[in-house]
A protein has these predicted regions:
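Short helix-coil junctions and helix-kink-helix linkers
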Residues: 31-42
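Positively charged, polyanion-binding regions of nucleic-acid-associated proteins
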Residues: 4-27, 31-32, 49
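A generic structural-conservation signal
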Residues: 44, 61-62
Length: 105
């Protein structure tokens, strides 16, 4: 797996979060949806997510019982390679300020 592909995937994931949820009000997000919309290979996506998690840019919720899922469903989760599977992604970066018209008077 090329480092450049992982770095590009990390940027794409953060850009997707910025576009989909700029005010950080709609998370958590489903990893498989993000991966499909970005057209990323699973291995590259999973590694990029793990690096963003380690850098504390995102939060990922671990699935409580991933091995009870059918293999096809488990394959949709983010795998850390050590037996932990993540079922959601939330942005930990600061939100953009709300527009003035969105704030009640």
């Amino acid at each position: 797996m090329k480092r450049t592909a992982i770095e590009a995937a990390k940027k794409a994931i953060l850009a997707w979060l910025d576009d989909a949820d700029p005010f950080r009000t709609h998370g958590p997000h489903v990893p498989a949806k993000i991966r499909r919309e970005l057209g990323l290979e699973k291995a590259v996506f999973d590694q990029a997510v793990m690096e963003l998690l380690q850098a504390r840019k995102i939060y990922c919720a671990p699935h409580d019982h991933p091995h009870r899922l059918p293999e096809a469903e488990r394959a949709e989760l983010v795998a850390d390679g050590r037996g932990v599977f993540y079922c959601s992604i939330s942005d930990r970066r600061p939100a953009r300020p709300l527009p003035a018209e969105a704030i009640p008077a």
